[in-house]
């Protein structure tokens, strides 16, 4: 019995030591990341020439990510949802947002959180469009709502 308790203690200590080492190894791989929105490389979003994106970190096709995104002037995304939460900070222009509670004009320096599964409409200002930083807790998707 004493030997079993002792062995369980040893195994637990090894698991903890390995976990701490693994976490520290992950943290040491993190590096400072600086990207200028004006210098970023934007590409048109697949299937939509009115939206362009510049990946900052992660992969929006498969995982949590951060991107600079641009809506062309007057862009209308229509009613839709996303599976995962989306956090937005507008840099330039205006991100137009509407849901059942009303409409919002989200301007430079403003923050907007859209919960996953929340039905909403979004678009770009008619004159300036919108440039914003967008971050999500998972892959990006666009689910049209009728």
Which residue ranges define each predicted feature?
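Bacterial N-terminal signal peptides that target proteins for export
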Residues: 1-10
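A short, N-terminal "cap"/entry segment at the start of jelly-roll beta-barrel domains
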Residues: 21-65
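Solvent-exposed loop/turn segments at secondary-structure junctions
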Residues: 60-63, 75-76, 94-97, 119-121, ...
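Conserved short histidine dyad/triad with adjacent acidic residue
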Residues: 62-82, 115-117
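Glycine- and acidic-residue-biased ligand/ion/polar-headgroup-sensing regions
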Residues: 72-75, 82-100
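Short acidic-glycine-tyrosine-enriched beta hairpin
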Residues: 100-117
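Ligand-binding loop in jelly-roll beta-barrel domains
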Residues: 116-140
């Amino acid at each position: 019995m004493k030997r079993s308790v002792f062995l369980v203690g040893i195994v637990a200590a090894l698991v903890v030591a390995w976990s701490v080492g693994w976490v520290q190894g992950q943290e040491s791989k993190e590096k400072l990341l600086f990207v200028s929105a004006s210098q970023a490389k934007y590409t048109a979003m697949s299937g939509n020439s009115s939206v362009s994106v510049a990946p900052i970190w992660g992969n929006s096709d498969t995982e949590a990510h951060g991107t600079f995104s641009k809506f062309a002037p007057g862009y209308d995304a229509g009613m839709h949802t996303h599976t995962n939460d989306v956090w937005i900070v507008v840099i330039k222009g205006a991100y137009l947002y509407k849901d059942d509670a009303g409409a919002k004009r989200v301007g430079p320096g403003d923050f907007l959180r859209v919960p996953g599964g929340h039905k909403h409409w979004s678009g770009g200002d008619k004159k300036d469009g919108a440039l914003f930083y967008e971050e999500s807790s998972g892959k990006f998707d666009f689910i049209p709502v009728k």
